[in-house]
Amino acid sequence: MSIDPSRIDIEFDPLRQRMVGVSAHGLLPFDVPFISEITDNLWLGGCEEGLVLPEVIAHLVSLYPWERYTVNHELDSLLEVRMYDSTDQAFEQVDAIASWVNTCRQAAPTLVHCQAGLNRSSLVAARALVLGGMTPDDAITLIRAMRSPACLSNPSFERWLRAL
């Protein structure tokens, strides 16, 4: 196949591109960038196949292996874990992932992503914040303020965090 001689180079910036939809839990509308900075070196977001990962991200934690970022730079670490946004998702692995996130973000910007950056990744990011000394209420409030009120709309995820 030949290349279109009139083709232009287009860059897609996940900090500017937006995801718009309605959450599966609570039917809450959301309009968010693909990734959002929550606090120092902690980024939260969604993914779309082929979206280019910003070079600022050094550590990538993917909770949604069904779609992948295109990574054009060397990552310091990559962790891929299959999680579901369901009310019967088990929580056994959350502490280990959240601890890993805290280790990574001590060194460099770390992105935790799932499909939309609302529930699975918010669960892990909130738990990382709690393990770092924040109260569950403060962690949930921060994530919702910095990302979307639709974050942690999965009732079992929010209930688990608040019960800690």
Spans of features found by a protein language model:
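A phosphate-binding catalytic loop at a beta-strand-loop-alpha-helix junction
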Residues: 108-126
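Charged phosphate-binding loop/patch that engages nucleotide di/tri-phosphates or the phosphate backbone
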Residues: 4-15, 150-164
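Short, intrinsically disordered low-complexity segments
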Residues: 6, 15-17, 119, 126, ...
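A short, flexible N-terminal coil/short beta segment enriched in small residues
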Residues: 1-25, 50-56
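Cysteine-based protein phosphatase catalytic domain of the PTP/DSP
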Residues: 23-109, 127-160
